[in-house]
Amino acid sequence: MDWSRAKNILIISFVILDLFLGAQYIQMIQTQSKIIREDQINRRQIEELLDQVHVRANMDLLERKMIPEQLGVYKATVSEMEGSWKQEEQGSYIRTFSPRLSCKNEQDLEQILKQQIPFFSDFRYAKALSSDQRRVYVQIVDQVPLFNGKVEVFLENGQIESIRVLHFSQLERLSVVSLVNVHTALYRLITNWEFNANATIKSGNIAYRSKVYNSVDNEHILIPYWYFESGKDYLFIQANSRGQNEEVEKMSISNPNSKGTNET
């Protein structure tokens, strides 16, 4: 074997060894990161991460938010609406009024909704999602908002033009899960989402989101999430302490019916 060939083999061997050691190092860091994320992440580490990605957050405000230690995971079905209600592709029901219904004020509006929707008492007004042309009411489960379950009232000149309803019923608790704290939730968010430069995380809280479980029987799974307000969006990350799925989902605050995304 000539020296040139031997040298090439030696170089290739070093490259392979370097790649192997690099892979081992990355795996070690990921393993350590997992331990930190679940058990040891603290405010100082979060603030360092925020600095690295050039994102601002009011940590005092975020840490003051009181959340439950545990929440249920539920199986549920979409409630059916009869009569003049028409079912839409995504499972919600809509009713259009011609002529439009008059309402004098917010109390008058809610009284009309109670007459039109038999389970309206399951919903609460969501000011952040509402506007002059649309009122949004979010379903409450275990005293926590379920963002997919909602009543939307579309207004024209102060009159009701149409109402859209998506309500979940026949809730069956499948399990109880422990929820991660705000530090772990922020860690998952920061390490799984590409923020715009100089973005701000304004607030954080817990909510449910629904996932289709059985499309034939119209069954859904209700899962607890942390959600954070950033810019014009809510960013959702699973709140389960086991962290099976750490993808970030985005929902537009001004258009909550827009399709969620995992991209910036």
Language model features with spans:
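Preferential activation on post-signal-peptide N-terminal prodomains/segments
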Residues: M1-P145
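Surface-exposed beta-strand edges and their flanking turn/coil or helix-capping segments
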Residues: K34-R37, G149-E152, F168, S175-S178, ...
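Short, surface-exposed beta-strand/loop "edge" segments at domain boundaries and coil↔beta transitions
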Residues: C103-K104, D142-N148, S169-L174, K232-Q238, ...
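Extracytoplasmic/luminal low-complexity segments enriched in Pro/Gly and acidic/polar residues
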Residues: A185-T264
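Exposed beta-strand-loop-beta-strand "reactive/processing" segments of non-cytosolic proteins
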Residues: Q115-N157, N205-A239
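Short low-complexity stretches enriched in small and charged residues
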Residues: Q116-Y125, H183-E194
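Short helix-loop boundary/capping segments
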Residues: F154-L186
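Short, charged/polar low-complexity linear motifs in solvent-exposed/disordered segments
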Residues: Q40, L179-N181, S254-P256
